[in-house]
Amino acid sequence: MMSSKPTSHAEVNETIPNPYPPSSFMAPGFQQPLGSINLENQAQGAQRAQPYGITSPGIFASSQPGQGNIQMINPSVGTAVMNFKEEAKALGVIQIMVGLMHIGFGIVLCLISFSFREVLGFASTAVIGGYPFWGGLSFIISGSLSVSASKELSRCLVKGSLGMNIVSSILAFIGVILLLVDMCINGVAGQDYWAVLSGKGISATLMIFSLLEFFVACATAHFANQANTTTNMSVLVIPNMYESNPVTPASSSAPPRCNNYSANAPK
């Protein structure tokens, strides 16, 4: 015998998740489109994502989005580069002047070294070896490279200035020895007195300029070596504490929801 009571079925509520969660500043029932973006949060996110640039000499920060680290170069790089730029120009000009003086006095030494009939001229081993000419040319090249490197400050010019100044310092040291020999071997009988006197004076002058060139070349090579080695130092990498994504999700201050419905939603 069947009962006349209607069969009661459990009420089934189909819950559909809401793809547009309401926020605190939106009216109930108003849904925010997926494509809309909070411009204020986007601007704040872009400011937080961009690392701060450091303008101190020798320190550079990475500002490309998507990178997780900030690269910083050792601060001593800026000091070494500034020292080289300040000193290399003045020292290079001195080297050029010394080179021109060597070539000029070398021509005079060549003229007084000739013998006329039975009268001997000034015997110069420096002229025989050609030191006033190839030495002066080397000094001019070193000075020109130093001046160019102080203006453009490229790695190639700095290395070239370093190499040429080392060569010039060696040549200047050799020239000092040759000029000392010239001052010692002259003054024998049969030489022209005025030629010997002039030759010794010119040799002494060139020796002073050679000593000056030696110290100037060593100083320039020192500054160039500092500028070259400090730029090859390892780069300090600092982890970026900020998020690289310039768009940050809007913070929701909506009240807690029960069964996918807001607590203050109209019933």
UniProtKB/Swiss-Prot annotation:
Q: Does the keyword Isomerase apply?
A: no
Transmembrane spans? 92-112, 121-141, 161-181, 201-221
Region described as Disordered: spans on this chain: 248-267
Any one annotated GO CC term = plasma membrane
Q: Which UniProt keywords apply?
A: Membrane, Receptor, Transmembrane, Transmembrane helix
Q: Where in the cell is it found?
A: Membrane
UniProt topology in membrane: Multi-pass membrane protein
Q: Could you tell me which InterPro entries the record lists for this protein? A: CD20-like, MS4A
Biological process terms from the Gene Ontology for this record are:
cell surface receptor signaling pathway
Superkingdom of the organism of origin = Eukaryota
Topological domain ranges for the Extracellular compartment: 113-120, 182-200
Cytoplasmic compartment segments = 1-91, 142-160, 222-267
Main role? May be involved in signal transduction as a component of a multimeric receptor complex.
Family, per entry: Belongs to the MS4A family.
Q: What is this protein called?
A: Membrane-spanning 4-domains subfamily A member 12
The species is Homo sapiens (Human)
The gene coding this protein: MS4A12
